[in-house]
Amino acid sequence: MASGKATGKTDAPAPVIKLGGPRPPKVGSSGNASWFQAIKAKKLNSPQPKFEGSGVPDNENLKTSQQHGYWRRQARFKPGKGGRKPVPDAWYFYYTGTGPAADLNWGDSQDGIVWVAAKGADVKSRSNQGTRDPDKFDQYPLRFSDGGPDGNFRWDFIPLNRGRSGRSTAASSAASSRPPSREGSRGRRSGSEDDLIARAAKIIQDQQKKGSRITKAKADEMAHRRYCKRTIPPGYKVDQVFGPRTKGKEGNFGDDKMNEEGIKDGRVTAMLNLVPSSHACLFGSRVTPKLQPDGLHLKFEFTTVVPRDDPQFDNYVKICDQCVDGVGTRPKDDEPKPKSRSSSRPATRTSSPAPRQQRLKKEKRPKKQDDEVDKALTSDEERNNAQLEFDDEPKVINWGDSALGENEL
């Protein structure tokens, strides 16, 4: 017997509750976008991607038999002098039976389509994963456990735990075009390109350039909120926010250089990669409460393990050696260099060098203004380009498994 409360019910779907923050970028028609971020060619007319492993992005929610699909080429353009100009292609992943090529079976030949499958995948089956509605869901960050695309491609770094208020460009570090497997990552760090600290410093600079300006009032609020929720604003020293650095007790992290530079020190961002999130700290720590005269004291003991085969293992060890109980010290490469003997001697009438002839300054010619800039892109092209960065000469950064995680800069 039907209940009287059922009166007025309909079969209409429940309204979608959208998360806060700005809308994510749209790709193609609404509701038909890839679940994953794109890989981007480094140069125009690059060949189609080849993968070290299966080429299927990591997705722990799917069984092995469902891990198959295709990468589809997406042409890109940007406005420029004299009209729109092509930029290197982007490639998006879709599961078999979904997306723009949903009518194709796995392996069917078509221009701009590259089929991929994990070992043990049932390529005769069709996926029920569907596609992404950009108004409701963010792109999922790309990760390849068995090896990514070849060196002709790259992708922008997106932290795994980012919120909807942070777009992919919030931590855009031009992330690795080939994240190494654990076997291949051992002992391969070399050159300034692989320096974790330098790259972390670059991320901070990029964030400050692209991010919104922090007002003095906002900076003051960041530095003086409840102690456990404070963050260091740009231009602040560490001890201005968290008190003087000490040895052997709480507040023992940071040498004099880090204290002076605050978040400008790239080592800060590097170490934030190892700091637990709020949830990890609460549910993964040994929590010890203790009543004291001034209130309830909560102690959180958490251990982060950096595997020895992590590509940045040596850098993390180096930072810890410098910064744990580091008050009163500075990195060796930051110590002031002694003046040379010739420059330290006072100049005399006989030994003073002859004055240098000053070069005539060249007159700066005014730059020619662009007379014609065609910004007319079609609506589809604007949607396709909305999420993409146009880096003329992107630097490949190999973060591997130790990519910068969630931070609160």
UniProtKB/Swiss-Prot annotation:
GO terms for molecular function: RNA binding. Residues 358-367 have a biased composition (Basic residues). The modification Phosphoserine is found at S190, S192, S379. GO terms for cellular component: host cell endoplasmic reticulum-Golgi intermediate compartment; host cell Golgi apparatus; ribonucleoprotein complex; viral nucleocapsid. It is found in: Virion; Host endoplasmic reticulum-Golgi intermediate compartment; Host Golgi apparatus. Residues 180-192, 247-259, 368-384 have a biased composition (Basic and acidic residues). Homooligomer. Both monomeric and oligomeric forms interact with RNA. Interacts with protein M. Interacts with NSP3; this interaction serves to tether the genome to the newly translated replicase-transcriptase complex at a very early stage of infection. Packages the positive strand viral genome RNA into a helical ribonucleocapsid (RNP) and plays a fundamental role during virion assembly through its interactions with the viral genome and membrane protein M. Plays an important role in enhancing the efficiency of subgenomic viral RNA transcription as well as viral replication. This is Nucleoprotein. It comes from Avian infectious bronchitis virus (strain SAIB20) (IBV). The lineage of its organism: Viruses, Riboviria, Orthornavirae, Pisuviricota, Pisoniviricetes. The gene is N.
